[in-house]
Amino acid sequence: MNQNLNLSPTAAPMPVQSPAVRRRNFEEVALGYDEITAMEEARRCLGCPGAPCRGGCPVGVHIPQFIAKVAEGDFAAAWEILSADNPLPAVCGRVCPQENQCQAVCVRGKKGESVAIGRLERFVADWHRAQQEPKAPSCAEEKGKKVAVVGSGPAGLACAGELARMGYSVTIFEALHTPGGVLAYGIPAFRLPKDILHEEIAGLEKLGVTIQTDTVIGRTIPVEELLKDGFSAVFLGSGAGLPNFMGIPGETLCGVFSANEWLTRINLMHAAEPGAATPLMPAKQVVVVGGGNVAMDAARCALRCGAEVTIVYRRGREELPARAEEVEHAEEEGITFRLLTNPVEILGDENGFVTGIRCDTMALGEPDESGRRRPEVVPGAQFTLDCDAVIMAIGTTPNPLLHRTTAGLAADRRGRLTTEEGSCRTSLPGVFAGGDAVTGAATVILAMGAGRKAAQEIDEYLRKNPSH
């Protein structure tokens, strides 16, 4: 046995801002490991020969190898291993749900807590960022071919980075004024500081990736025009940014927001800051509908804007889809959870402003097709919550613009682009797609995995079709 192995059954805790302090600022909640803590946690890794953790990583990071280098204190080598497969390690170390992926299959987790893989990933990425002259990844010899990437979210960034390393000339087309996609507009700074996102994107630009913002492909430039304009292939990674609503009375009242709008105003338009050009309405009592990570983000932002916040969710605590860590942080900060609660109407005054939300009390019945117990209405148990703002955080779907403006580009009835089974190939030759645009809203790391897979398929396609 390795004499330096750390046999502790528990992972090193993550230092965080105290709830009383952080509930009134947008600074990062988690503070990160120091070198000693990172090395001690890394020594908990058994270095399993079969590396089940790597199989649980959508981008295939060589997890035991990079952790072994952390244990040795060779952080530069750890970075080389980590960054070879993950172009956004500082992002993933903060927002990836490792507990459901790599850490879920960690052998140490069978008799205690899993190795804190995500925290170690974050540590290595932050250590690298702190170096005066961080080393840029190397690229293969230029292939003399151009590839267009539509969307600069996780899928697009991962695809672009992989292609650039292969030697392709890559241009990303982004509809917004700043790159990052959902990483920029959807995740608050207290979970993902924007300077970290910008630095990781700058790392891709050092590989030669060009980013063209304020360009809506499908409207400003048709997809077909990209192929005619010298691009040998196109990757569609436009995400799923169209918010869902419940279709209940009152959703058009003043004070009803989609979580997308609420978070975009705060993250991109700085609406929570004094003197903002597009300020948020000064809500005092906010109800957030939904139980996922987006609901937690919207609720915690509303809290930091000075409101009392209640999250309503139609199932129980065990069924909450948000990360356990995010739920715990929200509760620590003073957010109220009303579980087994389903809105049926948003109430308003004679001027059209929100005054409350009427809800049914629910009970859990038999499992539905998702495997979760189906929520059923409890008769005679309806009630009303007073509020002056409601935020709908019940999911998103892909924007139909691309398939509606591109002849022959197939999509399903939900607007998700369709691809060949097990592949990223769309119905159009030379056009590939992946991430939320194909699957619907999912996780950052799954989108990145799809982007990497698409890059490999594009490379294979162009090798087989050298005339393109």
Regions found by a protein language model. Give the residues of each.
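Feature captures the FAD/FMN-dependent oxidoreductase FAD-binding
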Residues: 77, 141, 146-150, 198-248, ...
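FAD-site-proximal beta/loop scaffold in flavoenzymes
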Residues: 252-283, 367-441
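N-terminal Rossmann-like FAD-binding beta1-loop-alpha1 element of flavoenzymes
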Residues: 146-171, 295-303
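Glycine-rich dinucleotide-binding loop and its adjacent helix/turn
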Residues: 124-141, 199-219, 243-305, 412-422, ...
